[in-house]
Amino acid sequence: MKRTHGRPVSLIKEEKMSYQPENITDILSRGVRESLFSKHLELVPQLNEVYELELAYYESKILTDEEIIRNGAYFARVGNTLTRHFLVCSGEPVRLPQHSSSRLRSFFQTNQFKTGYATHGLFPYRGKFHPQMIKGVINVMGLKPGDTVLDPMMGSGTVLIEAKLMGIKSVGVDASPFCRFMTQVKLDALTVPLTPVREALKNCRSVYDYFVKLAGQPNQGSKKRFGRDSGDLFSIRDSGDKYVPRSASRVDLPWGSEIPEVYNFLLLAYLDGAGYSERSDRKSPYDQFHAILERYLFVAEKVQLVLAGAESELAESKALEGDARCLPIQDSSSIDGIIFSPPYSFAIDYLENDSFHLNFLGTDIDRLREEMIGLRGRTLRQKFELYETDMEKVLSECARVLRPGRICTIVVGTNKNQLSKILEVPPGEVKGIDELLVELGKPHGLNLIRKLSRQITGMANTMRTEFIVLLQRR
C-alpha cells in the first residue's frame, strides 16, 4: 500500500472527500467582506473596486472604532453608530442642471459615496480626485486631527476639503489663480452664511445683472474665449489676494451679498454658469446661472445640516497661489503628509479647460502656460522632457518639507502606448509615469512602500490606469 508521510494514500483521499464539501460551504458562506472585516463594521454601499477594498482593509487595521466613525471613508456603520461619511453622503445626490446627460446623472447616483458630496460638487473639474479615495488615503497615511497635510498641486481643492472636514490642517498650492479661488470658495462654503445666499437666489436677476455689468456676458454656444479686455471682473481682486466687489456699486446686490464669502460663492456660480453657456445654448445664460446657484445652495445646505454643532472641529486650511517647484513653505520638515496628483499634461490642457474663467479673472494665460508643469515646451517630446525635469524639482521640495518617516502619496495616471509614441520606443520598453516618479524620488530619500492601482473611467483614450503611489521619507 502506498503511504504519504506515514499515512495510507487511500485514507488521505477519504479525508478529502469527507471534508471538502463542508469546507467549501463554510468558505463560500462567509464571503470576502466577512473574511476581511469584523462583524461590527458595515461597509458603505457602492464599494466595488479592488483598491477600495484594500483601502477599507487598511482603515480597519489602522483606525480605532471612534476614528472610523469620525473620519472613516469606507464604512457606513460601526456597531449601531452611523459614520459621518455615511451621513454626509446620504440623502438626495448632488443636483444637476436639467439638460445634464443621463450618463452624468447616472455617474453621480452610482458614485454617491465616492464623489459629489460635501462641497466637492461645486464646480465640476476635469481630472479631480475621488474625494472618498483621498479620505481613505489620508487615513492609511496615519494622519490625525492636528496634523498638517500638503497638496502642492491642489487643483480643485479635494485634499484641503477632506482634511478640513477631518480636523486635519492643510496647505494647498497651485499656479492657477482660478484653482486657488475655486478651492477657497469650496472651503468657505462649508460655513458660508446661508440666509444671504437664499436672498440672492430670490433676487437672482439682479445678481446676474451685476456680474454681467462687471464682467460682460458670455457668447452663448460660441465656444469663443474672452480676451483680457472683455470685462472688469479681474479688478475686484485686491492686494490681499481676496475677491471683493470694488468696480460696481454694492447697492446693486441683495442684502448680505457684500460679505466676502457670500460674494465669492455667487461669483463662482456665475463663472460656472458662464462656462456652461459658452459650451451650450440649451439654456439662456441667465437660466443657466439660476439653475447653478440653486444647486450650489442645495449643496451648502446639505453639508451644513450634517456639520451643525461640529463647526469647531473643522481644521484650518490655506489655499495659496504658488509654484510646486519652489514651495512657499519656509520651514523644512514641517509637514506631516503630502498628497498630490501631477497634471495629466498629455491628457488634459488645464488652461484651455479653464481659459474662460482665467480670462474673466484677468490672468495672463500665455505667461501662465510658460510656467505650468506639463504645459511647457513646443513638441510632445519636449513637453515630456521638461515635465520630467520639473517633477524632479517638485519631489525635491516635497522631501524638504516632509517630516522623516512620513508619507508622500502621488496619484498618477499613465498610458504606455501614448508615451511610446512620444518617445518613439516600443510600449514594452516604456516606463510608466508612476515608475518614473518612484525613480525621481529615490535620490531625495522618498522610498516606495506601497502601490495600488485602479482603472480610470472617462479618460480611456489618454489614461487607462491610475496608481496610488505611497513614498516614505527617510
Feature names for model-found ranges:
Residues H130, G136-Y210, L305-Q330, G337-F340, ...:
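Conserved S-adenosyl-L-methionine
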Residues L368, R406-V412:
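Conserved beta-strand signature within the Rossmann-like core of class I S-adenosyl-L-methionine
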Residues F181-V251, W255-G256, T363-G377:
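Conserved phosphoryl-transfer catalytic core
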Residues G121-Y125, R378-T389, Q418-E435:
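Acceptor-substrate binding/catalytic loop of class I
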Residues G6, L11-L143:
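S-adenosyl-L-methionine
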Residues V244-F340, S345-L351:
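SAM-dependent nucleic-acid methyltransferase catalytic core
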Residues T389-P404:
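A short glycine-rich, Lys/Arg-flanked "PGG" loop and its adjoining helix->strand segment in the class I
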Residues R403, N461-R474:
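Core SAM-dependent methyltransferase catalytic element
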